[in-house]
């Protein structure tokens, strides 16, 4: 399956919630009606969604939030199931620990897609070494920074300014003057923002 490159707001409308696919420069609720499905007048149906349909929608929503394709997502779930603890929470922690997501959480990219592009274009270093692998798992204590030659990019400066206004997650420590941050630890479930019901995904894969 190819990566979706169409209108981002349409995906959020389809899921009925903000998937944080667009920059925070303007509230998504101001741009489109999240309670209206895509289509000329919003698609409606009187039929009740099945349990399977609800579970599938939740999986699709999480895949879209993190920009992960089906095969990758299955691998993440298999790893989450193998680890000790709650499988659903493990899954979200693995997704949150992706380098592209950490770059986004540290405020170097205004969206996960932009953060992924920064990584792919070798604008990010981890512990002093350039990394261009968005799916790289960041570990506690790792230092993630913007390369010296990229620090003056307008999009990075703007993203960092917006992130500072909104506040950084507690599980990263960011020095905006140095354009670097430390991944302190994996986030707790309560630290992970977003309207996600990971138990539905566990139920889906347990069928």
Swiss-Prot record:
* Molecular-function annotations in GO: rRNA binding; structural constituent of ribosome
GO biological process terms, semicolon-separated: ribosomal small subunit biogenesis; translation
Name a Pfam family for this protein.
Answer: S4
Keyword Ribosomal protein assigned: yes
Q: Which UniProt keywords apply?
A: Ribonucleoprotein, Ribosomal protein, RNA-binding, rRNA-binding
Q: Which InterPro entries does this entry report, sorted A to Z?
A: Ribosomal_uS4, Ribosomal_uS4_bac-type, Ribosomal_uS4_CS, Ribosomal_uS4_N, S4_RNA-bd, S4_RNA-bd_sf
Describe the location of the S4 RNA-binding domain by residue ranges: 97-158
Q: Where is the composition biased (Polar residues)?
A: 42-53
Which PROSITE patterns does the UniProt record give?
RIBOSOMAL_S4, S4
Q: Which domain of life is it from?
A: Bacteria
Where do the record's region annotations for Disordered lie? 32-55
Signal sequence region: none
Disulfide-bonded cysteine pairs: these are: none
Q: Record's GO cellular component, any one?
A: small ribosomal subunit
The record's comment on protein family reads: Belongs to the universal ribosomal protein uS4 family.
Per the entry, what this protein does is: One of the primary rRNA binding proteins, it binds directly to 16S rRNA where it nucleates assembly of the body of the 30S subunit. With S5 and S12 plays an important role in translational accuracy.
Q: Quote the NCBIfam families the UniProt record gives.
A: PRK05327.1 (NF003717), rpsD_bact (TIGR01017)
Q: How does it assemble?
A: Part of the 30S ribosomal subunit. Contacts protein S5. The interaction surface between S4 and S5 is involved in control of translational fidelity.
Protein name as it appears in the record: Small ribosomal subunit protein uS4
């Amino acid at each position: 399956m190819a990566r979706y490159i169409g209108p981002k707001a349409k995906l959020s409308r389809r899921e009925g919630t903000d998937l944080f696919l667009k920059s925070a420069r303007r509230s998504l609720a101001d741009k489109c009606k999240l309670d209206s499905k895509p289509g000329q007048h919003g698609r409606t149906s009187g039929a009740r969604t099945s349990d399977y349909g609800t579970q599938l929608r939740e999986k699709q929503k999480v895949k879209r939030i993190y920009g992960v394709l089906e095969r990758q997502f299955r691998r993440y779930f298999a790893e989450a199931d193998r680890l000790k603890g709650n499988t659903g929470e493990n899954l979200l922690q693995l997704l949150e620990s992706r380098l592209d997501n950490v770059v986004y959480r540290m405020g170097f990219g205004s969206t996960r897609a932009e953060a992924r592009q920064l990584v792919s274009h070798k604008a990010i270093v981890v512990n002093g070494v350039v990394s261009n692998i968005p799916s790289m798992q960041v570990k506690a204590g790792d230092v993630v920074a913007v390369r010296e030659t990229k620090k003056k990019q307008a999009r990075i400066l703007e993203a960092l300014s917006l992130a500072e206004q909104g506040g950084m997650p507690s599980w990263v420590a960011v020095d905006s003057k140095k354009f670097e941050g430390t991944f302190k630890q994996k986030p707790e479930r309560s630290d992970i923002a977003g309207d996600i019901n990971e138990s539905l995904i566990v139920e889906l894969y347990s069928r």
